[in-house]
């Protein structure tokens, strides 16, 4: 969650959407070629492939792909190549067709949601390009009925509101909790997809209460909040929305502790025969949330309620909120902030 916190704090008032799964995959590739303190810093982001396979095997459309493109004239070390296996391909970075081919690969894989990944021709000094793309599409276990979708005010701030298409369902059973913390009170609800993934939505009690929650959104806290959920009959209202994102993650990752990974400080002596540096890390994302399903992409996812009461509560996301798409084992696939209905739509 630390990467999301850094991006959110630097983009106040803007929608944010990232895929920790995709980011970790690229950092894992760098780890395989790193040495010394660079490898030590990257080690906490190492992604185990079986974790991704576990998600892919469920009854959802989830795909992940990692590709490593190396300069054809460079000599890459056998130990590095063994670790990345068939993900590696040599290319001519000075050929404009190389960029077109890479963009086409990502475009097809994400079903047209990320295009282009690379906007500019690469520098002739480029030695290696590592990309990771993930695609997720899943139907809600309990779909929203379109007849209940209507225009509804969304409060961007206590004094500003805009109309959104608000999806609604009534009297259904979902895992829900009202959480009270020293930094603020909020509600959290789990909206399951068919299969073993779900969307967690974190909604502050106060219209302007999201920032303090973001600042305290750690993996430990998030797990604690999820463990507090209880099955509840509840009316749910969340906006339909589409969000796209484009980020150069270098500054964010440096602030997150990767101080010896980028630029001249990085040690990638286990990668190839050249003195290489990582100068950019581009992360592009897309999400579409509607009545039937959630579709998400990134390049760099039957509750039986045992309720003692039939009193119906309400969860109305009519002001800024955080949403997390995760697997049942706790793996976070995507995390985002929705706060600006007039942008990224």
From Swiss-Prot:
Which molecular-function annotation in GO is an example for this chain? serine-type endopeptidase inhibitor activity
Q: Which GO terms describe its cellular component?
A: extracellular space; host cell cytoplasm
Recorded hits in InterPro entries, A to Z, give: Serpin_CS, Serpin_dom, Serpin_fam, Serpin_sf, Serpin_sf_1, Serpin_sf_2
Q: In which compartments does the protein localize?
A: Host cytoplasm
Q: Which residues are marked as site: Reactive bond?
A: 306-307
Q: Say which domain of life the source belongs to.
A: Viruses
The record ties this protein, via PANTHER family, to: GH10112P-RELATED, SERINE PROTEASE INHIBITOR, SERPIN
Protein task: Viral serpin that inhibits both cysteine and serine proteinases involved in the regulation of host inflammatory and apoptosis processes. Major anti-apoptotic protein which inhibits both intrinsic and extrinsic pathways and strongly cleaves host CASP1 and CASP8 but is a rather poor inhibitor of host CASP3. Prevents the proteolytic activity of host interleukin-1-beta converting enzyme (ICE) and ICE-like enzymes. Can also block apoptosis through host tumor necrosis factor (TNF) receptor.
Q: Which family does it belong to?
A: Belongs to the serpin family. Poxviruses subfamily.
- Could you identify this protein by its name? Serine proteinase inhibitor 2
């Amino acid at each position: 969650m630390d990467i999301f916190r850094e991006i959110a704090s630097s983009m106040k008032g803007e929608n944010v959407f990232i895929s920790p799964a995709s980011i970790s995959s690229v950092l894992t590739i760098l780890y395989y070629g790193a040495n010394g303190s660079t490898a030590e810093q990257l080690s906490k982001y190492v992604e185990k492939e079986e974790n991704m396979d576990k998600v892919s095997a469920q009854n959802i459309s989830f795909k992940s792909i990692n590709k490593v493109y190396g300069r054809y004239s460079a000599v890459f070390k056998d130990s590095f190549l063994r670790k990345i296996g068939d993900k590696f391909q040599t290319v001519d970075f000075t050929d404009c067709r190389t960029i077109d081919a890479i963009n086409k690969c990502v475009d097809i894989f994400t079903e047209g949601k990320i295009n282009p990944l690379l906007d500019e021709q690469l520098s002739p000094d480029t030695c290696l390009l590592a990309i990771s793309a993930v695609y997720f599409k899943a139907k809600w276990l309990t779909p929203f009925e379109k007849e209940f979708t209507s225009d509804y005010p969304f409060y961007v701030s206590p004094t500003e509101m805009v109309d959104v298409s608000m999806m609604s369902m009534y009297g259904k059973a979902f895992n829900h909790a009202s959480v009270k913390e020293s930094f603020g009170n909020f509600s959290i609800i789990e909206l399951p997809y068919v299969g073993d993934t779900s969307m967690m939505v974190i909604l502050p009690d106060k219209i302007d209460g999201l920032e303090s929650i973001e600042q305290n959104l750690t993996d430990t806290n998030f797990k604690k909040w999820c463990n507090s959920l209880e099955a509840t009959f509840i009316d749910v209202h969340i906006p339909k929305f589409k969000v796209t994102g484009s980020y150069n993650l270098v500054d964010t990752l440096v602030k997150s502790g990767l101080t010896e990974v980028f630029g001249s400080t990085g040690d990638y002596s286990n990668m190839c025969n050249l003195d290489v540096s990582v100068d950019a890390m581009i992360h592009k994302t897309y999400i579409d949330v509607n009545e039937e399903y959630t579709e998400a992409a990134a390049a760099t996812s039957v509750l039986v309620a045992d309720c003692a009461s039939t009193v119906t509560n309400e969860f109305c996301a009519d002001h800024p909120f955080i949403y997390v798409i995760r697997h049942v084992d706790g793996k976070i696939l995507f995390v985002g902030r929705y706060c600006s209905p007039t942008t990224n739509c």
